[in-house]
């Protein structure tokens, strides 16, 4: 990875006065990184981000133990929010997916908010709205969802959630206005045009 480029990118994001920085969430790219590279990216962002900017780290890994290793690194770097992804290669049914996330969330610090990336259109495994609500009821720290869908798809799902279960849309900022209108708390866009998306927000 290009350390200098990443440092410059973080400083650029700081200059935009955004609310937070998220990393390791682009599945097509993050799965090409080694564990050491993931750790380095987390450390760089933790070091260079603005003091009052939230740090969100996506946790991926095929095995329970892989994700726990990365969670320890995230906790050591004072992540505010962890976004858990289901395994990328293996397709899990709703029950298996819920069990997987249950086993992970039990081991997350009580000082760290946690959510899941729920993207049925993009990931092999996802949770039903009912399973999302089970996690919400079981864990006081489970208060966020990173959705990946059109505003039309997300609208009825958001309506079924409690008001303090916040949904952020992804998809690089597509449909930002529509996403905000249906009740998304915000979006998690790509960096390239975050300045314009921040103005729209």
Each predicted region: which residue ranges?
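Active-site beta->alpha loop and helix N-cap motifs at the rims of alpha/beta catalytic domains
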Residues: 1-126, 143
């Amino acid at each position: 990875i290009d350390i200098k480029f990443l440092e410059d990118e973080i400083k650029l994001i700081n200059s935009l006065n955004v609310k937070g920085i998220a990393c390791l969430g682009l599945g097509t790219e993050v799965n090409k990184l080694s564990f050491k590279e993931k750790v380095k990216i987390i450390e760089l962002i933790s070091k260079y981000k603005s003091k009052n900017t939230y740090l969100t780290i996506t946790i991926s890994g095929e095995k329970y133990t892989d994700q726990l290793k990365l969670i320890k690194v995230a906790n050591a770097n004072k992540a505010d929010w962890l976004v858990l992804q289901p395994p990328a290669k293996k397709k899990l049914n709703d029950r298996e997916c819920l069990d997987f996330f249950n086993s992970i969330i039990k081991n997350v610090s009580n000082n760290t908010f946690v959510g899941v990336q729920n993207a049925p259109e993009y990931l092999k495994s996802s949770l039903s709205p009912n399973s999302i609500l089970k996690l919400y009821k079981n864990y006081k720290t489970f208060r966020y969802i990173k959705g990946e869908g059109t505003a039309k798809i997300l609208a009825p799902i958001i309506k079924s959630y409690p008001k303090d279960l916040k949904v952020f849309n992804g998809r690089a900022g597509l449909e930002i206005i529509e996403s905000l209108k249906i009740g998304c708390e915000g979006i998690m866009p790509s960096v390239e045009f975050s300045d314009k998306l921040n103005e729209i927000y």
